[in-house]
């Protein structure tokens, strides 16, 4: 995944001066890339990483922040492992390090989510948590229908903590479990760009946005080329008409719109080219296309009734005169 590699290389070079921010990133990397192991009755802290650059960053932070010596070994690609990995291990002082980073609680028990001090830290520390999680277990796919920024988590509690951290950065993320693997996913294009910036991938986000815009232009061009298809033309006309009527309904009803009807109307206006079925998938929680259609019908009917009662132009007043030429 070239994009993932680009992001990780850029993030591995982010310079951080604040000790608390460096510590937040390091603790999250350790939590998401390995964790604690018992070796010869001693607690060892291990971290399996993608690149030698990241391994050097982790070893440098371990030495400078906690004064511990770490070993590194190379795990060659084989079988299910498609690429070479780098294992950083701390044996001497492993338990002390685990306590200092919050991987062990006060009762010497491994934490299940993220250390509390990380999830309640400053905005800069929260961004470092996400940077560490992505460096340890993140992927970024190309812009398009299936675009996603995704982090594989060590468990459900860690996933939920990461979702909460994203919320602190004003980014909407969702946790999901597939075949026992917990992941946190960001799918909205704007949210992906916002998270990349927050983590510090300023260069990569520019490239990602350019790719996204090119894909949108191509998709729009393809739709225009296919407009000769009568079904597509009718769908386009119906979408234009629906949006025009919903906009007029919002004007007529003003603040009197019931929240559930307003939500359906906002969905229609936000995703103007989407079918009713697609609108249902965009809803949170998801709705059936019949539920979406029903709410929009009730919204229009309520607006038209108020328009008649008050002698106002109805929802048809906003329909374009050249609708047949769409």
From Swiss-Prot:
N-terminal signal peptide: none
GO molecular function: DNA binding
Origin superkingdom: Bacteria
DNA-binding region of this protein: 275-308
InterPro entries per record: Homing_endonucl, Sporu_reg_WhiA_N_dom, Sporulation_regulator_WhiA, Sporulation_regulator_WhiA_C, WhiA_LAGLIDADG_dom
Coiled coil as UniProt keyword: no
One Pfam family per UniProt: LAGLIDADG_WhiA
GO biological-process terms attached to the record: cell division; regulation of sporulation
Function: Involved in cell division and chromosome segregation.
Family (UniProt): Belongs to the WhiA family.
Protein name: Probable cell division protein WhiA
Species annotation: Clavibacter sepedonicus
Gene: whiA
């Amino acid at each position: 995944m070239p994009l993932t590699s680009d992001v990780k290389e850029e993030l591995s070079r982010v310079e951080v001066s604040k000790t608390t921010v460096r510590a937040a990133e390091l603790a999250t990397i350790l939590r998401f890339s390995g964790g604690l192991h018992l070796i010869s009755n001693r607690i060892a802290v291990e971290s399996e990483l993608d690149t030698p650059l990241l391994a050097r960053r982790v070893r440098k932070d371990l030495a400078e922040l906690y004064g511990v010596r770490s070993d590194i070994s190379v795990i060659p690609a084989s079988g299910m492992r498609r690429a070479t990995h780098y294992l950083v291990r701390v044996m001497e002082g492993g338990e002390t390090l685990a306590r200092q980073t919050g991987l062990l609680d006060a009762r010497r028990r491994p934490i299940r989510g993220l250390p509390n001090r990380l999830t309640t830290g400053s905005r800069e520390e929260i961004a470092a948590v996400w940077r560490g999680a992505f460096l340890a277990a993140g992927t970024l796919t190309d812009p398009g229908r299936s675009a996603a920024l995704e982090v594989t988590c060590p468990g459900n509690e860690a996933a939920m903590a990461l979702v909460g951290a994203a919320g602190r950065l004003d980014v909407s993320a969702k946790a999901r479990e597939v075949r026992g693997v917990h992941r946190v996913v960001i799918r909205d294009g704007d949210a992906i760009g916002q998270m990349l910036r927050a983590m510090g991938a300023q260069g990569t986000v520019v490239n990602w946005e350019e790719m996204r815009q090119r894909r949108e232009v191509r998709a729009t061009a393809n739709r225009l080329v296919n407009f000769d298809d009568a079904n597509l033309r009718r769908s386009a006309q119906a979408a234009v008409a629906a949006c025009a009527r919903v906009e007029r309904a919002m004007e007529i009803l003003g603040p009197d719109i019931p929240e559930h009807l307003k939500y359906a109307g906002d969905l229609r206006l936000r995703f103007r080219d989407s079918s009713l079925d697609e609108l249902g998938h965009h809803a949170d929680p998801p709705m059936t296309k019949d539920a979406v259609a029903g709410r929009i019908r009730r919204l229009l009917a309520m607006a038209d009734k108020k328009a008649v009662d008050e002698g106002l132009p109805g929802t048809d007043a906003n329909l374009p005169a050249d609708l047949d030429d769409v």
